[in-house]
Amino acid sequence: MFLPTDAATQYYPYFEFYGQALKSGESFLWNPHLFSGFPSYLSQSAGFLDPVNIALFSALDSFFAYHTRLALDLFLVMFFSYLAARALGLSRLAGMTVGPAYILAFNWGYLSNPVIVNSMFLMPLLVWGAAKIGEGSHRWRFASIAGAGVGWSMLSGYAQITVYAAVLFGLYMVADQLLLRREYAWRAFLKTAATLLLTGAIGVVVALPQVLPAL
């Protein structure tokens, strides 16, 4: 986006190494330019194992691929914010303002930080998913979509944002059952628990390339 310190001194060099490794067919699992060598992909390096990043940085110049990914992330924020707003009953016009408001609520310096921006889509995605699940239709489909979003954020984004968004998703599901739908039967609790377990399981499976090496 712009040129703050984090991008200029950390992420541009990270992704220049990453892009060059992909284009030359060499391994990006060991970065010889950090210390005496360091497995950058294990840190919060914004998704060296993310298939979207692999495709972008294999095909494009590293600088252009970096900013293309940021633009894609911000588009997804706008898209899922609109869907979430509509699912919550807002008008089309009001829904179109939610994404920009959400983005502007962040420190603008973060908008060039891929670790942060790669996870910004998750909150509106999970709000949309929870709202659609609460409607009672296609519960398992939207739980699966939510799980895929959690996994993608774990794979390429900021762990703190991912955890916060996932916790909010769980609280929303429980509050929707108890306070809005007022369902207190044990079957309702089992259904909510199964929904959350499915979401979590899919998230872990999607994120396995990042999770397993870090264990």
Positions of predicted regions on the chain:
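Aromatic-residue-lined binding/catalytic grooves and analogous aromatic/hydrophobic interfacial grooves
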Residues: 188
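Membrane-interface coil-to-helix junctions
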Residues: 1-79, 100-121
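Membrane-embedded helix bundles of polyisoprenyl
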Residues: 76-88, 92-179, 192-214
